[in-house]
Each structure stands twice: as C-alpha cells, then as structure tokens.
Amino acid sequence: EVLAKLKKMASHNRIYEDLYRGAGAYRHYIPSLVNALSSRGEFLTAYTPYQAEMSQGLLQSIFEYQTMICELTGMDVSNASVYDGATAAAEALLMCRDPKHRRVLVPASVHPQILQVIRTYGEAYGMTITVLECPHGVLEESVLREALSEDTACLLLQQPNYFGLIEDAETLFAAAAEKKVKGILHINPIAAALLPSAKEAGAVIAVGEGQPLGMPLNFGGPYLGFMASVSAMMRKLPGRIVGQSTDHEGRRAYVLTLQAREQHIRREKASSSICSNQAL
C-alpha cells in the first residue's frame, strides 16, 4: 500500500530520459563495483588513518586515487580530497592569497553555488571577490585585462562553465600570468578527458566536483571535491597527502606525508582545518 501510494505521488513528476540539465549534479552510470566496495565496513570511512602502519590497504587506495587525479589534471601532486567541488575552489583561493594579494577574479559564468561558498570563505579571510560580467556566456580577454590589478591574487575559471560553454582558458590564464596572477581551473572530470589538462591550460591549481565519476545524485550532495597543484604549491595544499616510501626492510610502504601543514600539528597556523576526505 505504501509503495502504491508513493508510485502515485511519483507519477506527478515529469521524467526526462535525455536531459542535459543538472547544474553540477548529473545522473551517470555507476559501476556495480562502486556499491560493492562501499558496502565493506572496513573500507568505508571518511577518515584518513593516523596510524599508517595499520592501514596500508586504505592508504594505498587513497594514493592510487591521488595518482589518477594527477593524471586527469596534469598536475604534480594531489591531496586525499576535500568535502565537495565548491569547497575545493574556496580552498584553492586561500592557497593563492598573501598580505599584498587578496583580490580574486571570478567570471559570472561560474556556478552560483560555488560563488556562494567562495564569498563565505572570502569574507572570513578578508578577501575581495570581484565578479566579472560575461554578456556572451564566456569571459572575454578584454574584460579580464581591465580587471587585473596589483592586488589580484588569482583568477578562477570553470571548464565547461555553468552555461555549458568552453572558456578560452589558455588565453585567459596567459593574460593573468603577465600580472603574476595565479590561475585556478575548476573542471568537470568527464570533460577533462577530452579537453587540454588544467596544467596545459596554464592553471597552477586544478579543482573539481567528483560526482560525475560515479556517485549517486544524493539530493544534490555532498559529493567529492578533488584538488591538485603544481609542485611549487604543494606545501599550501589543504588536507591529507598520502606518499609512497619504503620500510626498513625495503618493502613498499604508504605514509601520510607533509603533515607539518595540518591542523593537528600547526593548529590555527595550518594551511586548512580539513582533515577528513571523500576519496572513497
């Protein structure tokens, strides 16, 4: 009776079999392996282990995840992930700031919910978020050059953008680099397989939302935020980083590396307060 009532209620919905809407949350095919692994109690956790010697399997899985994110983005190093794509974008802004550079340029073609999170972070950290108009759906080079200033820290682009259009990231990041402004590219991981990598486009940090890789819609989130950067920015990355080493007998071992950046050691001076991950 309950199922019949629910089906009757659901019949009022309009179902689209082929739909290109979603605004960042899309219905993708999910391999059965995903559900099989996520049902394993010893594997399903949002926490990166503190005792590396007891958790080699979990650490290896995160290390392999980091490796694949680096391959996808073309970057040198990845962290163990953050809460979602919007958080990843906001954390990337914090990586670029310094006392003399606290202005962030963001085109209006970026997802409005990402912009909301960025503004929240910016207000807390004393950063100025400048939104650039995109009358034709993409950011134009002339608009960017006019907005660049001495206190600009970074430029954030989304690829493809909120309107589904492809930004001319290479040209825009090159223009920003002339003023020593860092480039951040927020990418769709599925589209990233077809487009030039974030590093090839001229970005120094790549972030994105991992939901298209095989996560249920889950009423809009939270999902998975991935982050990767060039090696020069490595010590500013938030969250955990798993590294590969060898033990005293020469066997391969996985460890949590560069922990001096993290909040359990540096407290309020840490690069971020994030210490959990969504990589699984």
What are the residue ranges of the model-derived segments?
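Active-site C-terminal subdomain of aminotransferase-like
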Residues: 213-280
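Conserved PLP-anchoring active-site segment centered on the Schiff-base-forming lysine
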Residues: 99-113
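Buried hydrophobic positions in well-ordered alpha/beta secondary-structure cores of metabolic enzymes
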Residues: 1, 69, 104, 118-119, ...
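N-terminal entrance/gating region of PLP-dependent enzymes' catalytic architecture
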Residues: 1-64
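Conserved active-site segment immediately N-terminal to the catalytic lysine
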Residues: 199-215
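Gly-rich Lys/Arg/Thr-decorated short loops/hinges at beta-loop-alpha junctions or inter-strand turns
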Residues: 40-52, 70-74, 100-101, 122-129, ...
